[in-house]
Swiss-Prot record:
<keyword id="KW-1038">Host endoplasmic reticulum</keyword>
<feature type="compositionally biased region" description="Basic residues">
    <location>
        <begin position="380"/>
        <end position="400"/>
    </location>
</feature>
<feature type="region of interest" description="Disordered">
    <location>
        <begin position="348"/>
        <end position="400"/>
    </location>
</feature>
<keyword id="KW-1043">Host membrane</keyword>
<keyword id="KW-1048">Host nucleus</keyword>
<keyword id="KW-0519">Myristate</keyword>
<keyword id="KW-0449">Lipoprotein</keyword>
<comment type="similarity">
    <text>Belongs to the polyomaviruses capsid protein VP2 family.</text>
</comment>
<keyword id="KW-0167">Capsid protein</keyword>
<keyword id="KW-1163">Viral penetration into host nucleus</keyword>
<keyword id="KW-0472">Membrane</keyword>
<keyword id="KW-0426">Late protein</keyword>
<protein>
    <recommendedName>
        <fullName>Minor capsid protein VP2</fullName>
    </recommendedName>
</protein>
<feature type="region of interest" description="Disordered">
    <location>
        <begin position="99"/>
        <end position="118"/>
    </location>
</feature>
<dbReference type="GO" id="GO:0042025">
    <property type="term" value="C:host cell nucleus"/>
</dbReference>
<dbReference type="GO" id="GO:0075732">
    <property type="term" value="P:viral penetration into host nucleus"/>
</dbReference>
<dbReference type="GO" id="GO:0043657">
    <property type="term" value="C:host cell"/>
</dbReference>
Length: 400
């Protein structure tokens, strides 16, 4: 990781001795892969055997020796591959230009090797406003020259991300968004992505499970103000899943109590239905995950995150707010909408009728109907009176 501290030195050397290093290595790819360093060794060894000295500048030597090490370090750390590819791509672009240190008007497209910058590379939009310290450079447009990264400390660091890398983003932002803004954007991102997916959006918006999920997420973000260690929303999600599992078991017990136990007589059809539901859930998950917007030049593929909290910031395409939704939130949302948590509404209604007896208003209505005037009701009352008197006389006679 110490090679990252030498990034300003590498960029400055690429400006001063980039053309010389490119002529020695033959190509920018050879510099990045280490072939240029081998070529440099062959030249110096051959000159030593002949007893001659070939003047090679210190800047060119730095480029040939440090760039391969930087490439290996960025590829070894998976979390910094995206940022390393863009950084090395910027160095390569500076070396491949007609005037070392300037970026050509037409930037190459991205490649899997990380040697070229990604499509739409715009360092100025991503917060790179670099100026040369060695000589004035005439870039295709202002602010596009590569120079050492400004060194200043970040007041609040982010675990797992070097300060100098985050400074590239922080220099473009006037201030970081508040926790409430972060939560609102994440919630809006979840709703909008699922709405655009078009899969049972009404049920998901109106479901109590989603409301409880968002409340748990909000609680997780608010807890950050008290302690960083207690702000991880993953714990809240895990608790939510456990509570949903217990709720599902309670609903099954309600079904059995209501007289509708689970149908186990057809295991084959039940298994096939479960497999179909799982396939549909997986398809929805993949579709929704693929439709999520991604920033073109974020340092990480999922944005900058702090212990599970995803921070949104403007991208290089014009100040549009971007967000990144982690996969576990999508997974939990899919689980909340799974068929295992759905039970027949008939059983629920029957159980509710048993738990909630007839209301007093219904009883009053029945009493009014029974007391309404009518011949039948009068005859019935007379018959009842006659029966009661006859019974009382017989009892008295027996007693006498």
């Amino acid at each position: 990781m110490g090679i990252f501290l030498a990034v300003p030195e590498i960029i400055a050397a690429s400006i001063a001795g980039g053309a010389e290093a490119l002529s020695i290595a033959g190509s920018g790819a050879a510099i990045a892969t280490g072939e240029g360093l081998a070529a440099l060794g062959g030249i110096t060894e051959g000159a030593a055997l002949l007893g001659e000295t070939i003047p090679i500048s210190e800047a060119a030597t730095t480029v040939l020796t440090k760039v391969p090490e930087l490439v290996q370090a960025t590829q070894a750390v998976t979390a910094a591959v995206q940022g390393g590819a863009g950084l090395v791509g910027g160095i390569y672009t500076a070396l491949a230009s007609d005037h070392p240190g300037d970026l050509p008007p037409n930037t190459p497209t991205g490649s899997a090797s990380g040697l070229h910058p990604t499509s739409g590379y715009n360092p100025q939009g991503a917060g790179l406003n670099l100026q040369s310290v060695h000589k004035p450079i005439h870039a295709p447009y202002s602010g596009m020259a590569l120079v050492p990264i400004p060194e200043y400390q970040l007041e609040t660091g982010i675990p797992g991300i070097p300060d100098w890398l985050f400074n590239l983003v922080a220099s473009y932002l006037p201030e970081l968004p508040s926790l409430q803004d972060v939560f609102n954007r994440i919630a809006f991102g979840i709703w909008s992505s699922y709405y655009n997916a078009g899969s049972t959006v009404v049920n998901r918006v109106l479901s109590d499970e989603i409301q409880r999920l968002l409340r748990d997420l909000e609680y997780g973000f608010r807890a950050t103000l008290a302690s960083i260690g207690e702000s991880d929303p993953v714990n809240a999600i895990a608790t939510q899943v456990r509570s949903l599992a217990s709720t599902a078991r309670e609903r099954e017990l309600l079904q059995i109590t209501a007289g509708q136990p689970l149908d186990l007589s057809r295991p084959t059809s039940a298994l096939s239905a479960a497999a179909g539901a799982l396939t549909e859930a997986a398809y929805n998950f993949i579709y929704d995950a693929s439709s999520l917007p991604k920033d073109g030049f974020n340092a990480l593929s999922e944005g900058v995150h702090r212990l599970g909290q995803w921070i949104s910031f403007s991208g290089p395409t014009g100040g549009t707010p971007h967000y990144a939704t982690p996969d576990w939130i999508l997974y939990v949302l899919e689980q909340l909408n799974a068929d295992t948590y759905k039970i027949p509404t008939q059983a629920v209604k029957r159980k509710q009728d048993e738990l909630h007896p007839v209301s007093p208003t219904k009883k009053a209505n029945k009493a009014k109907k029974s007391s309404s005037p009518g011949t039948n009701s009068g005859n019935r009352s007379k018959k009842r009176r006659g029966r009661s008197t006859s019974r009382s006389t017989t009892v008295r006679r027996n007693r006498i």
